[in-house]
Curated annotation (Swiss-Prot):
Residue ranges annotated for the HTH gntR-type domain, each copy included: 8-76
SUPFAM superfamilies membership: Chorismate lyase-like, Winged helix' DNA-binding domain
Organism: Bacillus subtilis (strain 168)
Keyword Disulfide bond: no
Protein's name according to its UniProt entry: Uncharacterized HTH-type transcriptional regulator YmfC
UniProtKB keywords: DNA-binding, Transcription, Transcription regulation
Pfam families: GntR, UTRA
An individual GO BP term: negative regulation of DNA-templated transcription
Molecular function (Gene Ontology), one example: DNA binding
DNA-binding region: 36-55
CDD domains: WHTH_GntR
InterPro entries: Bact_HTH_transcr_reg, Chorismate_lyase_/UTRA_dom_sf, Tscrpt_reg_HTH_GntR, UTRA, WH-like_DNA-bd_sf, WH_DNA-bd_sf
Coiled-coil positions: none
């Protein structure tokens, strides 16, 4: 069906048509779209109009263009979350009606770096508990997690088999996470982490660096969470003052 009968800007009609085709299953997730020549002919528009529509669709994360390969339908995120709301990864997975799981990679007690010492206000000689693991949703790896906790707030013997670090802290130290200061960093393919998360080469990662504070405004947890950008989408509610 040609789009020429519509009086709106042609590129807007093309955008709507491609979105409808994806919604109706004509093009499926990760499927390659026809070439620009074929698609422009099918839609009855110029290649310049089609390129403008594809540019906007890429900005909206509807499609992804791979140089020298083609244009593909972007996979939909499984998880949508307001970043102003502090939830554990476990809670986010459960809210998506999926089953959370954990692949433990390593744990150790180590001496803090200079940044860690400043972050946690540690005295000389105080150590950190370091935990590295992968969080899964229905068995699929989606988040690579690195967590650091001061040893002086943990008992001599404790279990880190709990799915949630928030639960671990509350049960073992009495610390209730109240808020976190978060830095967000988009990164590309990571040689170590991306293969563990079973990412395609073009799949980006979203890194959240978070210092968590308890009910007494004390820093008790520092986490590095690498989210698959094709599975997670975060949004922020901004208010005018």
């Amino acid at each position: 069906m040609s789009t020429k009968a519509d009086n709106r800007h042609l590129y807007l009609k093309v955008i709507e048509r491609i979105k409808e085709d994806i919604k109706n299953g004509i093009y499926t997730e990760k499927e390659k779209l026809p070439s620009e020549f074929e698609l422009s002919k099918k839609l009855g528009v110029s290649r310049a109009t089609l390129r403008e529509a594809l540019r906007i669709l890429e900005e909206e994360h509807v499609i992804i263009r791979r140089h020298g390969v083609g244009t593909f339908v972007h996979s939909k995120p499984l998880f949508l979350s307001g970043i102003e709301q502090l939830n554990s990864v476990t809670k986010m997975i459960e809210q998506a009606n999926m089953t959370p799981g954990t692949i433990f990679l390593s744990s150790q007690v180590l001496m803090p770096s200079e940044d860690d010492t400043k972050r946690f206000h540690l005295a000389e000689g105080q150590e950190l508990f370091y935990l590295e693991r992968v969080r899964t949703a229905d068995g699929q790896p989606i988040v690579y997690c690195i967590d650091k906790i001061p040893m002086n707030i943990l008992p001599n013997s404790f279990s880190h088999q709990q799915e949630s670090m928030f639960d671990l802290l509350e049960k073992n130290s009495g610390s209730v996470i109240s808020y976190a200061v978060t830095d967000i960093e988009p990164i590309g393919y990571h040689d170590t982490i991306s293969p563990v998360l079973e990412c395609d080469p073009e799949t980006a990662l979203l890194l959240l660096k978070q210092t968590h504070y308890d009910q007494h405004d004390k820093p008790v947890l520092y986490s590095l969470n690498y989210f698959r950008a094709d599975k997670f989408r975060f949004h922020v509610l901004r208010k005018r003052f």
